[in-house]
């Protein structure tokens, strides 16, 4: 500490207080503490006492009426990570992004985040288990109250020489797109520490505002983008045949893996129709809806598909970890004679969506007006009147970057993502690709019969992908 005192003589009190604070939070490597403090001094970074709640924070908070606000992710490894290195990396990213250790204060007028004290053991839990699936669900299906002092929870599950890292976090803070950035940055610092006992500490500290999506437009297009008031929700009323809501309903995750041999062949087929992986997944989902719900062949079906608005941000590192996801409708007019007729309609619909220069930006200005011109309690009621929660929806996180997710040279051997647990009749499916395999999941609130319904839905959906692979 003497070296820091000599270098920053006018910061002695700050250095002493910050050193003790970081030690009390579980950071026991003094050299790393000094590096973190010096970076804060050089960048004039001071941990605030409170932070502004952004528009998407409020939108996701409003959605607590029909979902638990928690997003989930799991990664499988064939070794045991260094627990201290993982703890230190977590502390460093939390210190750099104070909203991660904050409480959401709903004062009904203008909610905000109150930055809190914490210990790393409140973030990371290490669990010995002989049943990965049970332990995973026990951890992932828990909630995180907005009054919690930390908004990310991590579990390291250990079974012999294998391990699983499970993450659950408050969706008000971060969506799946920025979770990938978060975990990539976390692991980058973990790996550097394991190898060299240092960390680059290059975490994103920029704005979390939804308005970042407009920054790289020219002035003319920016004005037009900020005028896209009308929403584009599909307003489709179809639902899967869930049971009625009951007292015995609980949270659960239904999962399905489509093997690479089938998935890759289906991808090649879809390419011949000028389609994408998102088109493939949407086609199989819609085809399964027609079959499970026994819909007439001429019935129109529309689902909502997630759109990552980071497509409009040229340098994502200038922004903070946040939500930049909205939804666009994918609509087919009829079932057609086979799955390929659905595919053609999906590809055509999504091509038209992509021709829109402002795809995904529709409705954002209206949300902003709602939250910026009224006190929060009133805005929540008004926004809730026009905010549409789709019954049928898809969010594809995409292909996992195995190198970025490697720990000490060990690439993950498996991964899965699950969104918030939504109440019936919502069936929000999340997807990712790892090692060529397509991993699907739906997190829901229901009973055992509902879980069987979703598992059957996944079986039918997988058959639709297989049909696409047999072109």
Would you name each region that the model predicts?
Residues 220-275:
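Flexible, P/S/T/G-rich "lid" or insertion loops adjacent to the active sites of thioester-utilizing
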Residues 89-90, 255, 321-400, 405:
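Helical lid/core segments from catalytic subdomains that handle acyl or acyl-like groups
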Residues 295-300, 388:
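Short helix-terminating capping/connector loops at secondary-structure junctions
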Residues 294, 316, 381-384, 418-419:
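Short proline/glycine-enriched turn/loop segments at secondary-structure junctions
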Residues 310, 399, 445-447:
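Short, glycine-/Ser/Thr-/acidic-enriched flexible segments
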Residues 197-235:
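Secretion/export-associated helical scaffolds and adjacent low-complexity Pro/Gly/Ser/Thr-rich regions
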Residues 299, 303-335:
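Acidic/histidine-rich catalytic neighborhood
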Residues 1-209, 267, 271, 276-297, ...:
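Non-catalytic N-terminal regions of enzymes
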């Amino acid at each position: 500490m003497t070296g820091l005192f000599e270098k920053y003589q006018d910061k002695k009190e700050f250095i002493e207080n910050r050193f003790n604070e970081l030690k009390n939070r579980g950071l026991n490597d003094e050299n790393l503490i000094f590096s973190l403090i010096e970076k804060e001094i050089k960048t004039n970074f001071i941990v605030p006492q409170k932070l502004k709640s952004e528009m998407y924070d409020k939108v996701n908070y409003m959605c607590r009426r029909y979902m638990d606000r928690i997003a989930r992710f799991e990664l499988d490894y064939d070794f045991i990570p260094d627990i201290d290195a993982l703890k230190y990396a977590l502390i460093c990213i939390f210190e750099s992004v104070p909203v991660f250790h904050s409480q959401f204060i709903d004062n009904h007028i203008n909610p905000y985040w109150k930055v809190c004290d914490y210990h790393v053991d409140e973030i990371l839990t290490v669990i010995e288990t002989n049943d990965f699936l049970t332990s995973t669900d026990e951890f992932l299906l828990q909630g995180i109250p907005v009054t919690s002092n930390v908004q990310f929870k991590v579990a390291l599950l250990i079974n012999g020489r294998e391990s699983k890292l499970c993450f659950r976090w408050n969706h008000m803070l971060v969506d799946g797109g920025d979770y990938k950035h978060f975990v990539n940055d976390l692991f980058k610092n973990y790996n550097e520490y394991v190898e060299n006992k240092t960390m680059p500490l290059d975490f994103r500290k920029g704005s979390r505002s939804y308005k970042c999506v407009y920054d790289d437009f020219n002035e003319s297009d920016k004005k037009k983008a900020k005028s896209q008031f009308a929403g584009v929700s599909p307003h489709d009323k179809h639902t899967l045949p869930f049971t009625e809501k009951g007292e015995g309903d609980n949270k659960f995750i239904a999962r399905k893996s489509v093997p690479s041999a089938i998935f890759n062949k289906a991808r090649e087929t879809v390419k011949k129709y000028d389609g994408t992986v998102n088109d493939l997944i949407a086609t199989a989902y819609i085809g399964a809806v027609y079959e499970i719900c026994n819909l007439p062949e001429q019935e129109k079906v529309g689902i909502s598909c997630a759109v990552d608005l980071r497509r409009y941000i040229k340098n994502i590192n200038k922004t903070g970890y946040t939500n930049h996801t909205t939804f666009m409708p994918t609509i087919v007019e009829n079932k057609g004679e086979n799955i390929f007729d659905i595919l053609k309609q999906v590809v055509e619909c999504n091509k038209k969506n992509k021709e829109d220069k402002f795809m995904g930006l529709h409705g954002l200005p209206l949300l902003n007006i709602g939250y910026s011109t009224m006190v929060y309690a009133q805005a929540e009621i008004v926004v809730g009147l026009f905010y549409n929660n789709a019954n049928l929806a898809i969010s594809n996180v995409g292909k996992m970057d195995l190198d970025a997710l490697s720990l000490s040279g060990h690439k993950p051997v498996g991964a899965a993502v699950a969104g918030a647990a939504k109440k019936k009749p919502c069936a929000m499916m999340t997807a990712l690709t790892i090692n060529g395999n397509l991993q699907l999941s739906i997190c829901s609130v229901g009973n055992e019969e509902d879980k069987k319904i979703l598992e059957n839905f996944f079986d039918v959906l997988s058959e639709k992908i297989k049909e696409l692979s047999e072109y």
